[in-house]
């Protein structure tokens, strides 16, 4: 019934395309009129549109004219005319949706339409790509169009200094990577002067490869961190001990004889010790003198040892050289499992990177303490409007809509897509599969057909390369080890009988043109004459026709990826813009996807039914594969959804802190803010020693006096005052405490330079807030890591997490207020030498931060010398008494820690 209705009225996607086609017709009707305009008249349109917006007109009304303007500018500056389907894509992006556009349909050109329209408001447009190369390339390619129309274009890449970043963000349209935009947001919320902040409002963002950024990278938050204590000795110790542990093939074993020391869960990439393993590692640690004879690993004080052990166990059992990482220049370089790209400068978290460094015998770098963090899910929600482009979003439409509120619209291709997708072939073993791939390649290149082979790992690409060399088949390899040659390898991939092996082509961002890349060939000529160019074009046309006759580019997948989307991205490299093409996947029952997620009984039946070299290729197996991929996709979706639910708790707190911090930063004078905080602190302090409505006999006036003296440098004899006038009630005493704190502060600062005092007040607020927020993030991390244990007590971990996170946040805010007022109570005029020393120490402490993408760290830091020169000048003020830390003995002499005595907030 549903299919019948769809045939009559069309699907939702078809109805949407039909609706926006009317807008496209209007844009097309304007083309003759805009073609008649002079360059100056066309350029003047930008000023006209901005005036109309200022007078109350809305962007939707301007859209047809603005798109017609960009189309005409594209024709004049780039000799590129936006097709009708590209106009549809632009409308989809303007409306805050995801446009699924096949490879070769010109997504880079499409982005110019909504980018120009939305930049007319003056609030800026961000265009996000997956790497620096694509950001630079796209900005350079499209800058002629934007600049012709009077729009400024900026690019954010890793090596820019703060001033260059600020200038790039001030442009009408700014290109850059998701990591750079996210890290700049976090750094801006760590700045100590307004001038150090580089970003402006987050108005409208267009995300290229939106599925890769919002889904593949959503599980790993962006983190700004600073180095913590050196723990290389412990990693080296456990790295030496872990190889003595034996692996158990599955979690449950039938008898004790089969039990080993640990087992792994490949789905979640975790390793777990058995009871036998715990006993074995405890004995080894006791022999090493790390554990006492009567001690055990379950003890709370050994939690850090368990951290090192688990990290090393995962490093040895789950992460493999040339598959998950490579060693380059004595450093561990992560390989992105989705794209196959090496990611230099990035690091795994939770001690895993240090454990792998120990495993491979390279220098172990210190772990890091979180100073600021955010997930991509919550970062992009900060924008007023989000839009995205990709070649493969439909399979992830549910997640994009449920988490980001983004609707996916499939854009028709400009020319019909004629790729031929063959059935998968499944073999009993990996070797048989690779032999079949080699024979297929041999047959295809014999007729001049170019072949692109997609592999899931560097190891697989090198195995296949070795087999091809034995057969004397010429080929190129593109993986994380050959990343420098990427552009030239891709440019050659469409040549007749060319063979290219690539590790996960997803996100490569370069079209493979049949016959080779003509533009690259022309660019390589030195001072070419028109005759040279004509000859190159003629030769290219011959090659192009020859490849088309041979069947176009053939895509061969050496195994199925966990996600159907990544497989579709690989397939999408063939048959661009109406060209012919083919695709085929070769699998074995030993491939990770089928081994981990297909049922064991089915796998055994298939293996028994296959004789040496035989394969299966029919619909039933396609269903099995799709079902296995569906399991993986569902599993990963649940992880991302779960991460978001937990991060939303911290995100609410982050918004409060960052908004409060920004108000401190922008205020010229924070004295009114501090006056309000002093009232809160006086109230808090008073009720620590005098419970509301309690009897006089229960008042601890002596303790209150000691706290006033040690924390606020105030001598106030409350007991004497009460003895002299026993009519003084609770409210009277509270007022005396409040007035004493206020008067003492006025007296302390009345003879100081007011500018220096105001500067120090702001600095103290920001520094104290940052310190407490950083400690709070650490507490939240510990809470998050342990909260699932509450399930054993029949409690809902998420509800417990929300409740305790709120309590931690409330306590953190109270402690922040108390400490900042206590700090300000101890200031005095400092010498010039002391001022310089304090300033230098602060600059050094802030120059050591790193930007991480949890699995991943970006070491391109923005805290260079230019920024340090702008650090807050803490002139003429310093503490009079020593700062009391929360874990120090309380100065009152009780013997308790400060946080449990006078630093305690009920």
Swiss-Prot record:
Coiled coil: none annotated. The keyword Transport applies. Residues 853-865, 877-888 have a biased composition (Basic and acidic residues). GO terms for molecular function: ATP binding; metal ion binding; protein-exporting ATPase activity. Part of the Sec protein translocase complex. Interacts with the SecYEG preprotein conducting channel. Has a central role in coupling the hydrolysis of ATP to the transfer of proteins into and across the cell membrane, serving both as a receptor for the preprotein-SecB complex and as an ATP-driven molecular motor driving the stepwise translocation of polypeptide chains across the membrane. Its main location: membrane. Belongs to the SecA family. Gene3D superfamilies: Helical scaffold and wing domains of SecA, P-loop containing nucleotide triphosphate hydrolases, SecA, preprotein cross-linking domain. GO terms for biological process: intracellular protein transmembrane transport; protein import; protein targeting; protein transport by the Sec complex. It is found in: Cell inner membrane; Cytoplasm. Keywords: ATP-binding, Cell inner membrane, Cell membrane, Cytoplasm, Membrane, Metal-binding, Nucleotide-binding, Protein transport, Translocase, Translocation, Transport, Zinc. May bind 1 zinc ion per subunit. Zn(2+) binds at residues 890, 892, 901-902. It is a peripheral membrane protein. PANTHER family: CHLOROPLAST PROTEIN-TRANSPORTING ATPASE, SECA INNER MEMBRANE COMPONENT OF SEC PROTEIN SECRETION SYSTEM. Its EC number is 7.4.2.8. ATP binds at residues 86, 104-108, 511. It holds the Pfam family SEC-C. Its cofactor is Zn(2+). The keyword Transport applies. It catalyses: ATP + H2O + cellular proteinSide 1 = ADP + phosphate + cellular proteinSide 2. Monomer and homodimer. Part of the essential Sec protein translocation apparatus which comprises SecA, SecYEG and auxiliary proteins SecDF-YajC and YidC. This is Protein translocase subunit SecA. Residues 853-906 are annotated as: Disordered. Residues 896-906 have a biased composition (Basic residues). It comes from the Bacteria.
């Amino acid at each position: 019934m549903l299919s019948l209705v769809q045939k009559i009225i069309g699907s939702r996607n078809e109805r949407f395309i039909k609706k926006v086609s009317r807008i496209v017709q209007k844009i097309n009707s304007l083309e003759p009129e805009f073609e008649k305009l002079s360059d100056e008249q066309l350029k003047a349109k930008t000023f006209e549109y901005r005036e109309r917006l200022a007078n109350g007109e809305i962007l939707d009304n301007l859209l047809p004219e603005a798109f017609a303007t960009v189309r005409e500018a594209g024709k004049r500056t780039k000799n590129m005319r936006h097709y009708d389907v590209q106009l549809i894509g632009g409308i989809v992006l303007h409306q805050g949706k995801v446009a699924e556009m096949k490879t070769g349909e010109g997504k880079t050109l499409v982005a110019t339409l909504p980018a120009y329209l939305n930049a007319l408001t003056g609030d800026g447009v961000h265009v996000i790509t997956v790497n620096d190369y694509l950001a630079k390339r796209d900005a350079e390619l499209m800058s002629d169009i934007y600049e012709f129309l009077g729009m400024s274009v900026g690019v954010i890449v890793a090596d820019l200094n703060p001033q260059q970043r600020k200038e790039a963000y001030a442009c009408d349209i700014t290109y850059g990577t998701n990591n750079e935009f996210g890290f700049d947001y976090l750094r801006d919320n760590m700045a100590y002067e307004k001038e150090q902040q580089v970003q402006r409002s987050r108005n409208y963002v267009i995300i290229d490869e939106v599925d890769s950024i919002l889904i593949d990278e959503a599980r790993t938050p962006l983190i700004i961190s600073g180095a913590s204590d050196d723990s290389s000795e412990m990693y080296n110790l456990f790295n030496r001990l872990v190889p003595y542990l034996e692996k158990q093939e599955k979690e449950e074993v039938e008898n004790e004889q089969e039990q080993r020391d640990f087992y792994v869960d490949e789905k979640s990439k975790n390793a777990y010790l058995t009871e036998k393993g715990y006993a074995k590692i405890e004995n080894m640690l006791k022999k090493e003198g790390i554990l006492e004879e009567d001690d055990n690993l379950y003890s709370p004080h050994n939690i850090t040892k368990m951290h090192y052990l688990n990290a090393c166990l995962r490093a040895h059992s789950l992460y493999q050289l040339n598959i998950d990482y490579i060693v380059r220049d004595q450093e561990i370089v992560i390989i992105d499992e989705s794209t196959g790209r090496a990611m230099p400068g990035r690091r795994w978290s939770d001690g895993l990177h240090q454990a792998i460094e120990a495993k491979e015998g390279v220098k172990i770098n210190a772990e890091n303490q979180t100073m600021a963090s955010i997930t991509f899910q919550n970062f992009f929600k900060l924008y007023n409007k989000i839009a995205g482009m990709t070649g493969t979003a439909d399979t992830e439409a549910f997640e994009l809509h449920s988490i980001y509120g983004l609707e996916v619209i499939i854009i028709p291709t400009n020319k019909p897509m004629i790729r031929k997708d063959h059935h998968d072939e499944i073999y009993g073993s990996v070797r048989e599969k690779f032999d079949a791939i080699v024979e297929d390649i041999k047959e295809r290149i014999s007729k001049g057909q170019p072949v692109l082979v997609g592999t899931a790992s560097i190891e697989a690409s090198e195995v296949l390369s070795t087999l091809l060399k034995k057969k004397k088949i010429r080929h190129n390899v593109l993986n994380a080890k050959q990343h420098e040659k990427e552009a030239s390898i891709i440019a050659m991939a469409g040549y007749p009988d060319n063979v290219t092996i690539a590790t996960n082509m997803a996100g490569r961002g370069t079209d493979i043109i049949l016959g080779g890349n003509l533009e690259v060939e022309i660019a390589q000529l030195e001072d070419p004459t028109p005759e040279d160019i004509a000859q190159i074009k003629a030769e290219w046309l011959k090659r192009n026709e020859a490849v088309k006759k041979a069947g176009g580019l053939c895509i061969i997948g050496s195994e199925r990826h966990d996600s159907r989307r990544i497989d579709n991205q690989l397939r999408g490299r063939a048959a661009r813009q109406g060209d012919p093409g083919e695709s085929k996947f070769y699998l074995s029952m030993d491939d990770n996807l089928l081994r981990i997620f297909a049922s064991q009984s089915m796998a055994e039946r298939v293996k028994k039914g296959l004789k040496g070299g035989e394969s299966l290729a029919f619909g039933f197996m396609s269903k099995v594969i799709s079902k296995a991929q569906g399991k993986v996709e569902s599993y990963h979706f649940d992880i991302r959804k779960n991460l978001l639910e937990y991060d939303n708790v911290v995100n609410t707190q982050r918004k409060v802190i960052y908004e409060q911090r920004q108000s401190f930063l922008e205020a010229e004078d924070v004295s009114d803010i501090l006056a309000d905080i002093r009232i809160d602190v006086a109230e808090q302090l008073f009720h620590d020693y005098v419970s509301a409505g309690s009897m006089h006999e229960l008042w601890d006036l002596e303790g209150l006096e000691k706290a006033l003296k040690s924390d606020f440098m105030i001598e106030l004899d409350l007991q004497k005052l009460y003895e002299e006038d026993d009519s003084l009630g609770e409210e009277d005493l509270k007022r005396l405490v409040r007035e004493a704190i206020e008067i003492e502060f006025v007296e302390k600062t009345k003879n100081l330079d007011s500018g220096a005092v105001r500067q120090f007040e702001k600095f103290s607020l920001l520094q104290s807030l940052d310190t407490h927020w950083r400690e709070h993030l650490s507490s939240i991390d510990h809470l998050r890591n342990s909260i699932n244990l509450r399930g054993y007590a029949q409690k809902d971990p998420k509800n417990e997490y929300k409740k305790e996170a709120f309590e931690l946040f409330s306590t953190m805010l109270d402690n922040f207020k108390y400490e900042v007022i206590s700090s300000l109570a101890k200031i005095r005029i400092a010498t010039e030498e002391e001022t310089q020393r304090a300033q230098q120490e602060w600059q050094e402490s802030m120059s050591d931060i790193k930007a991480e993408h949890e699995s991943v760290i970006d070491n391109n830091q923005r805290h260079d010398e230019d920024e340090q020169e702008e650090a807050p000048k803490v002139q003429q003020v310093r503490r009079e008494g020593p700062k009391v830390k929360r874990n120090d003995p309380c100065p009152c002499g009780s013997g308790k820690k400060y946080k449990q005595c006078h630093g305690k907030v009920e």
